[in-house]
Swiss-Prot record:
It comes from Cronobacter sakazakii (strain ATCC BAA-894). The gene is nrdR. Keywords: ATP-binding, DNA-binding, Metal-binding, Nucleotide-binding, Repressor, Transcription, Transcription regulation, Zinc, Zinc-finger. Residues 49-139 form the ATP-cone domain. Transmembrane segments: none annotated. Its cofactor is Zn(2+). Pfam families: ATP-cone (PF03477), Zn_ribbon_NrdR (PF22811). PROSITE patterns: ATP_CONE (PS51161). The lineage of its organism: Bacteria, Pseudomonadati, Pseudomonadota, Gammaproteobacteria, Enterobacterales. A zinc finger (unnamed) spans 3-34. GO terms for biological process: negative regulation of DNA-templated transcription. Binds 1 zinc ion. This is Transcriptional repressor NrdR. Negatively regulates transcription of bacterial ribonucleotide reductase nrd genes and operons by binding to NrdR-boxes. GO terms for molecular function: ATP binding; DNA binding; zinc ion binding. Belongs to the NrdR family.
Amino acid sequence: MHCPFCFAVDTKVIDSRLVGEGSSVRRRRQCLVCNERFTTFEVAELVMPRVVKSNDVREPFNEDKLRSGMQKALEKRPVSSDDVEMAINHIKSHLRATGEREVPSKLIGNLVMEQLKKLDKVAYIRFASVYRSFEDIREFGEEIARLQD
């Protein structure tokens, strides 16, 4: 790691500690040239697969878009933001676990529906009605009947 003070290449780690519930490492470093000390933080970079939309357009995975879609479905429902974040993290780890560089948007939609079904049935129906483009009340009824099985 380069020294931020004198830009020397040689630095040494003098202390390391886990921070943020073990998700990152805080390191105290000292420059071997100017002897200045500084702190760095290390976090694992987890690469998400690209999303292939139904029209074959490819775009980077967008966590904000995922969160926004789930929050719309969960609007005014009794679900905590912690539960939503856990669901999002579950979806992201499932996508990473595929080992693929690209995943179809349909897979993401199905994972969202799976998580919403566990969190709140009303939110699940809201999301499903838009995601599956329900045309009439009969389709709502069929989906509700499937939920009750």
